[in-house]
Regions:
Chain A
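Short cysteine-rich clusters marking metal-coordination/redox-active sites
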Residues: 239, 253
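Flanking scaffold residues of small Cys/His-coordinated metal-binding clusters
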Residues: 3, 234, 248
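ABC family nucleotide-binding domain
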Residues: 3-220
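Cys/His-coordinated zinc-binding microdomains
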Residues: 243, 257
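Conserved beta-strand-loop-alpha-helix hinge in the C-terminal portion
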Residues: 222-237
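Composition-driven, intrinsically disordered low-complexity tracts enriched in small residues
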Residues: 204, 248-251
Length: 266, 470
């Protein structure tokens, strides 16, 4: 298995809005390594969501190619694509998109149902995942009885259900209050740090992005620059701000005192 | 938690909507259930009327043919000669099968239609001039007919009607030679024991119906109006006229019914059938107060009537087939309505849940997974509608069928309440396992048909677009 989970080469996507052509993505090149946590930054309309949809096989590019776990997904039929989506990709949405008539556990079980996992096994794994995101007690609650932050945790647990190669999160903190926002980014960073989950997160929130490993800036459908986030420093035991020695679990740098992990006050 | 649970939860999520749709489907299904039942009820009642009528006419014709030389003279005011007149023949039997088979019991003719006698007693001594010495007359047989019955009160349309239902009819005939042997004054079809014979007294010949009524058989004693008689034989009625009639000696009958010297009918037999009308004219001239009817007149009346019933029945049959056509159209409408209700509901549901469909696709549901989810929901809803339809149909079939089907009543010229009663068809939807299965199968099929396109559309939804859908 190659070290690169996601390899995007010369990716372009043009929409036709009536007679107008909208270039949503143009010549995007991006590599995401296994265990990396990348955030894609950019203003509204910069093509972030389009990129994520193409990466997640929800949309097809106009040109270029996307290799997901060494498989070229750009040439696949819809029939092959849903197989890729159910096994290789986990989606987290801005609006959580939980099914309102299913409880938390049942929502987490859904993707496992697609791959034909037995009921008992699905249940066991769903409860395990809910425990992992801190919702063991809320497993039988329906979404409307959960807070926004809790709903997003359920959505993250659902995304992890089939042990995908990559988690694609589209503005996962976009609909959350400050407290929940930090809880979610912390949860994602933890998953990445401790479980090695590969994550690509789209956000327009500079601060949230700064806690990831690598920030990719997208503007008018092009990647304009890249920058390291605090998570990269934590992985290298060096503060990204002052270079002082830190441990991956540290919340602030011992030398310069800057936050390494999101806190409620931050 | 599989696809079925999700379908059930989705349906129960919008309870009011589901309820409304199920009730609407229920009505469509009820139409589908009750219309065939209505058609069948009408067909059955037409069929039973047809067979009753033709049986009756054949029997009557046979018995008339045997006695073509007979001329009946009576003081009857109740009907002019022939039993089948006016309202008498409005045929309660057409009240949708409820009375079919009970078509026109002889009692309704007031004691036997072909006795021609009603029950108006006449003093035999006044008519001694009607005798065998008249030109062309072979024999004169005095007969006493007395109908014994009980009053029955029926309520129709808020009014009470009382009528007498005959239990049996006593017919006294002179058991003397050669009348008994040479003239058809006694039944010919003896099914048990023997016929009455000259000189018999204190004995009776019962009809099969009588044996049931009195609970006796040949050789038994039977008590009639307080007097004991011995049953010597049983006759199988040769026509509707004598179904309830028991025969005994004339003098026995007169004594028994306190009618000494009284008769109700003079049966005059002409020398041959060609003389019948001149004999009738002679008697009419002698006794203008008598109602004189020849069996020949009856036969031609019967034949005319047979023709008119034939055409009435033909009308009924064409109404029934017209009704079948109407029924087919209505069922097609109901089928279309059912499918359309499901179609629009599911189309709306699919639109409403576009984001959900996008989400399901994003997390790995295939088009087929999604299609089967919606198909199952549509079929489940229709099945619920089917169940409700059977219940509604069971409760309202007569009303629905009479609202939706043309009425079949071949004798609608006949006046009277019985005719009105005939229009309230007693249609029943029999909830048999077959009907339940058929209705549910139809519901499932129509549900599937109606859901097919919406579900297919859902399955073809492109996830990226669905996620953007607000």
């Amino acid at each position: 298995m190659s070290d690169v989970v996601l390899d995007v080469e010369h990716l372009s996507k043009t929409y036709e809005l009536g007679k107008r052509h909208v270039q949503a993505l143009s010549d995007v090149n991006l590599q995401v390594k296994r265990g990396e946590f990348v955030s894609v930054m950019g203003p509204s309309g910069s093509g972030k969501t389009t990129l994520l949809n193409v990466l997640g096989c929800l949309d097809t590019p106009t040109s270029g190619r996307v290799l997901l776990d060494d498989v070229d997904v750009t040439k696949m039929s819809e029939k092959e694509l849903y197989r890729i989506r159910r096994s290789k990709v986990g989606f987290v949405f801005q609006t959580f998109n939980l099914l309102p008539y299913l409880n938390a556990r049942e929502n987490v079980e859904l993707p496992m149902e697609c791959v034909g996992k037995p009921a008992a096994e699905r249940r066991r794994r769903a409860l395990e995942l809910l425990a992992k995101v801190g919702l063991a007690e809320r497993a039988e609650h329906r979404p409307q009885r959960l807070s926004a932050g809790e709903q997003q945790r359920v959505a993250i647990a659902r995304a992890l259900a089939n042990e995908p190669a990559i988690i694609l999160a589209d503005e996962p903190t976009g609909n959350l209050d400050a407290k929940s926002k930090h809880e979610i980014i912390k949860l994602l960073a933890d998953l990445n740090l401790k479980q090695g989950t590969t994550i690509v997160m789209v956000t327009h929130d500079q601060q949230i992005a700064s806690y990831t490993e690598r920030m990719v800036y997208l503007n008018s459908g092009r990647i304009t620059r890249e920058k390291q986030g605090t998570l990269a420093g934590r992985k290298k035991h060096a503060c990204p701000y002052c270079g002082g020695k830190i441990e991956p679990g540290d919340e602030t740098c011992g030398t310069c005192g800057k936050p390494l992990m999101p806190t409620e006050e931050a | 938690m599989g696809v079925l649970t999700r379908a059930v939860r989705n349906i129960s999520r919008r309870k009011t909507r589901a309820l409304l749709v199920v009730v609407a489907l229920g009505f469509s299904m009820a139409i589908m259930v009750s219309i065939p039942a209505g058609v069948t009820a009408n067909q059955l009642s037409t069929q039973s009327l047809t067979s009753n009528l033709s049986g009756l006419i054949t029997q009557t014709e046979t018995s008339l043919n045997q006695t073509l030389t007979e001329v009946d003279c009576s003081l009857s005011l109740r009907f002019q000669g022939f039993g089948f007149s006016g309202g008498q023949f409005s045929a309660g039997g057409f009240a949708g099968g409820s009375q079919a088979g009970g078509f026109m019991p002889p009692s309704e003719f007031g004691g036997g239609p072909f006795g021609g006698g009603g029950e108006a007693a006449m003093n035999a001594s006044l008519y001694t001039d009607v005798n065998a010495s008249l030109p062309d007359v072979a024999a004169v047989v005095p007969v006493l007919q007395v109908s014994i019955g009980h009053n029955v009160t029926i309520e129709r349309f808020g009014r009470n009607f009382t009528r007498v239902v005959a239990d049996y009819v006593i017919e006294g005939v002179p058991l003397v030679s050669p009348l008994v042997d040479d003239y058809p004054i006694l039944p010919v079809n003896i099914t048990a024991g023997r016929n009455l014979q000259a000189g018999d007294s204190g004995v009776v010949l019962l009809s099969e119906n009588n044996t049931g009524y009195f609970g006796v058989g040949v050789g038994d004693n039977v008590t009639i109006l307080g007097q004991t008689f011995t049953v010597v034989g049983v006759h199988g009625a040769s026509g509707v006229s004598d179904r309830l009639t028991l025969y005994m000696n004339l003098s026995d009958a007169q004594a028994l019914t306190n009618n000494t010297g009284q008769i109700t009918l003079l049966k005059v037999f002409a020398d041959n059938s060609a003389d019948v009308s001149s004999v009738a004219n002679e008697i009419s001239a002698l006794h203008p107060e008598l109602t004189v009817v020849t069996n020949q007149q009856r036969l031609s009346q019967l034949q005319a009537m047979q023709a008119s019933y034939g055409s009435a029945l033909q009308n009924a049959e064409s109404t029934v087939s017209q009704m079948q056509a109407t029924a087919t159209q209505e069922i097609v409408v109901a089928v279309a309505a059912t499918s359309l209700i499901i179609f629009f509901l599911m189309l709306y549901t699919v639109r409403e849940r576009t984001r959900e469909i996008g989400t399901l696709k994003a997390i790995g549901f295939s088009g087929w997974n999604i299609m089967s989810q919606f198909m199952l929901e549509g079929v489940l809803l229709s099945l619920l509608g089917g169940v409700v339809g059977i219940i509604i149909g069971y409760a309202t079939a007569p009303m629905l069928a009479s609202l939706l089907l043309p009425h079949v009543n071949p004798f609608n010229s006949a006046a009277g309440f019985r005719n009105a009663a005939a229009s309230s068809l007693s249609i029943q939807v029999l909830v048999t396992p077959t009907l339940v299965l058929a209705a549910l199968a139809a519901a499932a099929a129509l549900g599937a048909l109606g859901t097919l396109y919406p579900a297919w559309r859902a399955s073809r939804t492109r996830p990226a677009e669905a996620m953007r859908y607000e």
